[in-house]
Amino acid sequence: FMVYTEGEDGEMQDFEVKYVFGFSPLQQYMVEFDRPVDMPPTEVARVQVLRITWDTLKEKWFYLRPPDVPEKLEPDDPLHWTGVAQRWQTMCADCHSTNLKRNFDPAEQAYHTTFSEIDVSCEACHGPGSLHLELANSKSLFWDRRHGYGLAKLKGENAETQLQTCAPCHSRRGVLSEGFHGGDEFCDFYNLELLRDDTYFADGQIKDEVYVYGSFIQSKMYHKGIRCTDCHDPHSLKLKSPGNETCTSCHQHAAGKYDVPSHHHHVPGTAGAMCVNCHMPHRTYMDVDKRRDHSLRVPRPDLSVALGTPNACSGCHVKDQLKSIDQQKQPSLLEYADWIEAAEAGDEQVAAAVLKTDEWCDAACEKWYGENRKQPKHFSEAIVAFRNGEPGAMNELLRVATQPEELTPVLARASALGELAASGVGNVTAK
């Protein structure tokens, strides 16, 4: 297949589509550049990912634009499809192939990339399988128990091994060193993204494309030992149970505690009665991929009123304010994230509508729960105050940074330390 589009020199030309990859409903197309005629068939040269994309469900083409970049991309822009930010080797291959070796030659400025399988295969999670095969093919009558199965031990009482095996491809992180295998320590090889203003909201909710590990380790579920495979099939990644059963399969409390109107205050069977819509709100990435926040938090419209952070209640109810918005703006407000982004960008009309919704939701929670409503102090209050330069904010952020794990998630504490360090405050030690 061929595509006729603008090349890295700015000229329109034909390119051969060499590979196709993606995850339903996203299907993307790749073009190989600079391949020498004598390159072995087992090696891959520089590969660039086209921005023209196919939606397999809606069966239509669409342009996958970068976030917050509405204008046309010039050929010298890193975000142009021929640029480094659209390069398969640096942006995609780590998590969409197995045993990747980039083999970049700086002298030649060329790639000689290899991989075992162009997919997420067994060894991507279970580690090298050579010992496992050796044991399986052994003619000995006895299994060598010293080696177990010859694979990474992802099961057991400790959930950390499994979580840290999933984390490299389900987190936003920088690479510290190469060679991670299933069962290794995540932080020995990667630097996890902190709660920076452009990637997370101040309260730790997902904002930019940060995937799920960073949000999950903030959750009470994580601290209670819940692991990925408690909810997801490890091989298909599909949920093990439908609907609210994903949650009630563990939350088997006395009848009438959770999956009933007295708890969720919505009509059974509606969107508002779904556990995930309140505790795991979604944002859409890459135009078609809805990803849920895995911090599994209780909605806090009170924090939204005070700090401008999102909350799941307003996520559903903000659309009730659409008629108050100028008609020409309405088509751009398709999702809650669009409202939040417009408000943050300075649209006073949209910001007022969002705040009105937050206040309405906060009042509803107050009416429902009254004196039983829990509004504990949250680390986001200190982070926002510090960023705004408020008096006494440094001491509050120091308090967050030095709190024990059971009071404040380690990612929030590390982020507090990062904020303090960036401001020039030194000699801070977290326990």
Where would I find each of the regions flagged by the language model?
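Primarily the internal scaffold of c-type cytochrome electron-transfer domains
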Residues: F1-G22, Q28-F33, A45, V49-D76, ...
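Membrane-interface segments at the starts/ends of alpha-helical transmembrane spans
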Residues: D77-W81
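Exposed beta-sheet edge/beta-hairpin loop segments within beta-rich domains
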Residues: G83-A85
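Conserved catalytic alpha/beta cores of large enzymes that bind or transform nucleotide phosphates
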Residues: Q89-N103
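Residue-level signature of alpha-solenoid helical repeat scaffolds
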Residues: I383-V384, S415-G418
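Conserved hydrophobic register position within alpha-solenoid helical repeats
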Residues: R413-A416, K431
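Flexible loop/turn segments at the boundaries of HEAT repeats in alpha-solenoid HEAT proteins
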Residues: V425-A430
